[in-house]
């Protein structure tokens, strides 16, 4: 089971900058995917757009840590997969509402930043802190290195929400599963 530890942080220039660059990368990649779709009616998947960004030495892509840039491109990929799934449902008459291609983010806006486990400092986690790569922000946490999944920075109007996602084994689920395994044999006999 996944849980989230949330922290609210006041506005800072560092967080403003990384979320603004995230928005720029998202819009740049979205432009390339949309243009390709309009010209060929085919989809540029995550691997293709990632290769284009690397080969063109895109400034928006390289202005963020590589793993963060990849997560933003994966987010765009999920948005387009959802768009195409809706188109397929509409063709099968399972969806009757209008479908719109993913839109650009506001020019002056900010975008979510996802930092995977690999981009979080391991030495700080052992000390009970989350240190975001390329940022000087340290956040106290109870999450351990083995449980950590990712950290998300969500921009809001006058603050940021930092969500630390971690995995926990649900003891109740584990207990029920062990009961089911033991009772499976008895259930089969009762059904016969």
Regions found by a protein language model. Give the residues of each.
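Nucleic-acid substrate recognition interfaces
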Residues: 1-192
């Amino acid at each position: 089971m996944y849980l989230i530890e949330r922290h609210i942080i006041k506005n800072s220039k560092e967080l403003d900058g990384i979320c603004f660059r995230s928005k720029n990368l998202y819009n740049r990649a979205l432009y390339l995917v949309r243009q390709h779709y309009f010209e060929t009616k085919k989809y540029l998947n995550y691997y293709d757009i990632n290769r284009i960004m690397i080969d063109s030495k895109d400034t928006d892509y390289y202005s963020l840590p590589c793993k963060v840039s990849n997560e933003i491109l994966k987010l765009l990929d999920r948005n387009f997969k959802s768009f195409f799934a809706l188109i397929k449902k509409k063709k099968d008459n399972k969806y009757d509402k209008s479908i719109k291609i993913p839109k650009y983010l506001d020019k002056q806006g900010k975008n979510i930043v996802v930092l995977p486990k690999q981009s979080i400092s391991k030495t700080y986690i052992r000390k009970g802190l989350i240190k975001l790569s390329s940022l000087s922000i340290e956040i106290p946490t109870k999450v351990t290195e083995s449980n950590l999944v990712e950290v998300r920075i969500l921009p809001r109007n006058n603050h940021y929400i930092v969500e630390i996602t971690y995995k926990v084994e649900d003891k109740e689920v584990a207990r029920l599963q062990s009961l089911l395994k033991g009772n499976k044999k008895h259930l089969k006999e009762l059904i016969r």
